[in-house]
Amino acid sequence: MKFSSAVHFSQRGVHPTDVELETIAQTWSEHCAHKTFRANITTESGASRPSLINQLRASTDKINAPYVVSSFVGNAGIISFTPGRSLAVKCETHNHPSAIEPFGGANTGVGGVIRDIMGAQHTPIACTNILCFGPPDTDTLTLPEGVFPPRRTRDGVIDGIADYGNKIGLPTVAGAVLYDPGYTANPLVYAGCIGTSNSFVDQVAPQPRDRIVVLGGRTGRDGLRGATFSSMTMDATTGDVSGASVQIGDPITEKLVIDLLADAQHLYRAITDCGAGGLSSAIGEMAEGVGARVELTHAPLKYPGLAPWEIWLSEAQERMVLAVAPQQCEDLRTLCVLHGVEYTDIGEFTGDNQLVVTYNNEPVLQLDTDFLHNGRPQRNMRAVMPKPNRTTDQTAPKWLTQHGAADILMALLGHPNIASKASVIHRYDHEIRGATAVRPLVGQVGDGHGDGVVIAEPLDDFGFAIAIGVNPWFGIHDAERMALACIDEAMRNVVAVGADPDKAVL
């Protein structure tokens, strides 16, 4: 049965606390609950259509590829690569944060997908990104209030990606940079990460009496309400109102956690990262169907003065939450000391299906986990099905008829979407780890854009390819054909660098 939050608290006969309201807002946000993807859809004629998430899953279910280990659940998709070895893949946008704080938004976007790979029990080995901005020569006088010049946004985003990837020691190996006026106010920052594991075992649910252990960074006010902010429509006031929603990245701390988890896979039962919602989302998700009790005063803070809801909801970076059996806590603590990673026990999983949070032993939140995760109202949406424009205009643009072939060629080569992106690619270290067998820039002097890249561990005689397909302008005329064209381009690119198309995944 579905309840509104007001009905839920009325039936309990209590007033909600600020911690409870913030937790529900985060858990039910578009960013976390994917309400649009899960919405019931009807067309203009009244016909029902599958939800978007079911449509996305349908092709994977239909193909039923034997090498797909896990999809549409958990932190990342997982495929088998070679006997005893698996790969995890995760991509995620960080658009709103990058629009109001380009460096920090892109910086923590990279950190977030890296932690998702860690949460899938894989070791990160490479990063990707697709970036779309407004035209760099946009007249600043024409920009809406509160919108940064596209050149400033672009430079900040690229700086943020380079800073995190280079410092953490992961190669940024594949991507794209595109420009269009449609991305002026809200850029596309689509970060990705690939990880590998030689010992992947599907996680089990936390068990009653398991300890809730937080590893890595400390909690601060950065990243407050990030999940709800990312689900909002932006306007001229967004940067001022939501500036604190952008987290502060710390790649060195995250690198220490990566190294720790590579040695600690046998010491925990379940793991996830503090992404959107911080402890609220991480513990809330892990406690679904189990229950948990948390004491917030045990959480390590960057500085004093945080309110309970701020400690619980902060999206401060580089933190992982683990479910650890009591008898393994001391071994994990010892390993944390060895790796220089902070270890904090803040509670336990209970088995009563209740999420209880206290501050100085006083309750500030008590919610049934079934209500928290399944009680949100179902969204219903009406789909307007535009007719694709599949006609062909054979008339040459007037500009082309007024210029010679040489002028046209130079104009094309100088267009931001065609011109070399080497200046961007060289900002990223794509050689670190020594596993980039086919590089993003190829040719006799290494200045030509390749079709894709190949990652092969130094002692292996095999590898895997990464390639990208992107064409947003196609979607203006025909969204369905755009998707087909992008997949077609990506497939041709992986084939061009020697990959087997029968084992490709999206």
Predicted region positions:
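Glycine/proline-enriched, intrinsically flexible loops and inter-domain linkers
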Residues: 1-506
